[in-house]
UniProtKB/Swiss-Prot annotation:
Disulfide bonds: none annotated. The lineage of its organism: Bacteria, Bacillati, Bacillota, Bacilli, Lactobacillales. The keyword Hydrolase does not apply. The gene is gpsA. Sn-glycerol 3-phosphate binds at residues 108, 139, 141, 194, 247, 257-259. PROSITE patterns: NAD_G3PDH (PS00957). It holds the Pfam family NAD_Gly3P_dh_C. It catalyses: sn-glycerol 3-phosphate + NAD(+) = dihydroxyacetone phosphate + NADH + H(+); sn-glycerol 3-phosphate + NADP(+) = dihydroxyacetone phosphate + NADPH + H(+). The keyword Repeat does not apply. It is an enzyme of class 1 (oxidoreductase). It is found in: Cytoplasm. This is Glycerol-3-phosphate dehydrogenase [NAD(P)+]. GO terms for biological process: carbohydrate metabolic process; glycerol-3-phosphate biosynthetic process; glycerol-3-phosphate catabolic process; glycerophospholipid metabolic process; phospholipid biosynthetic process.
């Protein structure tokens, strides 16, 4: 493939990490953000110290604060902005974009209120004549490891196989490998909902529970993620792949995960408002918990872990009391309520 011009919308840790992958593959990368000091730092010092203290970026990676300039003559746009601003940024893109491009996203969340997936938002806000089918790039990936070129394998899902292959071709190299997938709903919901379980896994650690408990919440968390995803139209086998169990393992067991760290702090008795303030970064699992809880209520899907975490985050339930509530639920068969045939 010829070198591509790619706008990466979102200068956070994952946007920066993916920008480096694309740059390593010979593409022209333009990072867009609205923090003027951060954009100047990337251009002048080739660093993004808010997220990476000791990483120097290639000087060919350029940062833009003007969206129209960042999108000028690009071949592809990669959205890596927080879920809560995705619709706003998509509207802005639609206003200034002058030609058809590939649209990809690497965000993980559900929109508050609408409960929409990211691809749904992008489809609604960016006219079809300006884009192909949306590609979801998701899987087990810590930006802290990708930025130092550690081996990472993730999925690229689209309703159009050619679009998924495009994502595969621009990203894949010796340390970063993409597998194509056609289950957009499954890949997106797996990536979003695992953040909820990661908060719970972190809380168990903060409460002092051991590996048995952590394995249990990850496994049972996967079961309820699958239940909700299948009810939304996903393929159940997707949840046993990279974007499902893979992402759940990496996010639910690692100190690199901000969702896990937030849960750990909750388990130690801190309040979520203080945790978010101290971290200074978006904790997607917090807002996703609310959206998933409301969606599960609407679809009548049993999600006891999600419900408990919702009560801890939004109703001031004590985390340890929440664990006991789950343990005291009526006993049942392990595979109850998992309908793999949809």
């Amino acid at each position: 493939m010829n070198p591509q011009k790619i706008a990466v919308l979102g200068p956070g840790s994952w946007g920066t990490g993916l920008s480096q992958v694309l740059n390593d593959n010979g593409h022209e990368v333009r990072i867009w953000g609205n923090n003027l000091e951060q954009m100047a730092e990337i251009n002048e010092k080739h660093t993004n110290t808010r997220y990476f203290k000791d990483v120097v970026l290639d000087e060919k990676i350029k940062a833009y604060s003007r969206l129209d300039l960042a999108l000028e003559n690009v071949d592809a746009i990669l959205f890596v902005v927080p879920t809560k601003v995705t619709r706003l940024v998509a509207k802005q893109v639609a206003q200034v974009l002058k030609h058809k491009v590939h649209i990809l996203h690497a965000s993980k969340g559900l929109e508050q209120g609408t409960h929409d997936r990211i691809s749904t938002i992008l489809e609604e806000e960016i006219p079809a004549q300006l884009r192909g089918e949306i590609v979801v790039v998701s899987g087990p990936s810590h930006a802290e490891e990708t930025i130092v070129r550690d081996i990472t394998l993730i999925s690229a899902a689209s309703n159009d196989h050619d679009e998924a292959k495009y994502a595969q071709s621009i990203f894949s190299n010796d340390y970063f490998r993409l597998y194509t997938n056609t289950d957009v709903i499954g890949v997106e919901t797996a990536g979003a909902l695992k953040n909820i379980i990661a908060v719970g896994a972190g809380a168990l650690h903060g409460l002092g529970f051991g590996d048995n408990a952590k394995a249990a919440i990850i496994t049972r968390g996967l079961a309820e993620i699958t239940r909700l995803g299948v009810a939304m139209g996903a393929e159940p086998l997707t949840y046993s792949g990279l974007s499902g169990v893979g992402d759940l393992i990496v996010t639910g067991t690692s100190i690199h995960s901000r969702n896990w760290r937030a849960g750990d702090a909750l388990g130690r008795g801190e309040k979520i408002a203080d945790i978010e303030k101290n971290m200074g970064m978006v904790i997607e699992g917090v807002s996703t918990t609310k959206a998933a809880y409301e969606l599960a209520q609407r679809l009548e899907i049993d999600m006891p872990i999600t419900e408990t975490i919702y009560k801890v985050l939004y109703e001031n339930l004590d985390a340890k009391s929440g664990i006991l509530d789950i343990m005291r639920r009526e006993t049942r068969a392990e595979n109850e309520f998992i309908n793999i045939n949809k």
